[in-house]
Regions:
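Catalytic cores of eukaryotic secretory-pathway lumenal/extracellular enzymes that build
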Residues: 2-246
């Protein structure tokens, strides 16, 4: 089994415990998992003891989760999962994520699973693409849940990356740590393809919205975004595909 790094930002160890425990207890191959936390301040001595007892866990003190922070925490794992304290995992989740990555209708090595994971009380219970809702006059792109993938046979390619969830080869982190700018545009320019996960193998205790993104008019990738998804920043218009998320 290939090694998987689970990356998570949390206020403290207590906030992360339930999600990490859910990931570990429901994994088919627990020994293939390693864990990395980004914390706003150093843990207390009792917290460090609990973290050490949990298993292969390391941490970094940083005010925010950035790709540079992720790269620092990476220790050679082949795959990386950006996780959130609100996540809860179903049985054999890592096997299912790997299968979904292989099922992406793009080159496996360049695919990135993402999307709005469903909340546990969601009546539909499907993953939704990250879709464009509108472009404000100041160049701010606002996001919304796209069309739920209730019957999709495989992950669906799309333009946008959820900032709290992705699963990909670890090379994605290393590539994204270089450079700056809007994450989904940087991924697009570098040849990575975001794909909405088609099976809800992870659910959430509450919905995680995608914050608006202020896009600079000179950012790389805007022409490609317009051509492939009909999101036109110059005109401030969105295509049907942009509003669906795929």
């Amino acid at each position: 089994m290939e090694r998987i790094l689970i990356l998570m930002q949390a206020a403290n160890w207590a906030e992360a415990t339930e999600a990490l425990t859910s990931a570990r207890e429901n994994a088919l191959h627990r020994n293939a998992l390693s864990y990395a936390l980004v914390l706003p301040e150093a843990p207390t001595s009792p917290e460090e003891c609990n973290m050490a007892a949990f298993g292969a866990l390391r941490y970094l003190v940083s005010p925010e989760m950035t790709f540079a922070a992720m790269e620092t925490l990476w220790h050679g794992e082949r795959y990386a999962l950006l996780a959130h304290p609100a996540m809860r995992f179903e049985r054999d989740w890592e096997k299912k994520l790997l299968r979904a990555l292989n099922d992406c209708p793009v080159e496996n090595a360049q695919a990135v699973l993402t999307g709005y994971l469903p909340a546990q009380d969601d009546p539909i219970g499907a993953v939704c693409p990250v879709a464009a809702e509108r472009i404000d006059p100041d160049g701010t792109l606002c996001f919304a849940h796209g069309m739920p993938l209730t019957l999709a046979a495989h992950p669906m390619p799309g333009a946008f990356l959820h900032p709290d969830f992705f699963f990909a080869r670890a090379g994605f982190i290393r590539a994204m740590a270089q450079g700056s700018g809007t994450a989904f545009l940087r991924a697009m320019v570098q040849g990575w393809q975001c794909c909405t996960l088609n099976q809800p193998v992870i659910t959430l205790t509450h919905d995680l919205p995608v914050p608006p993104a202020r896009i600079a008019p000179q950012e790389d990738g805007l022409a490609q975004l317009k051509e492939e998804y009909g999101v036109d920043f110059a005109a401030g218009t969105l295509s049907a595909a942009g509003k669906r998320g795929f």
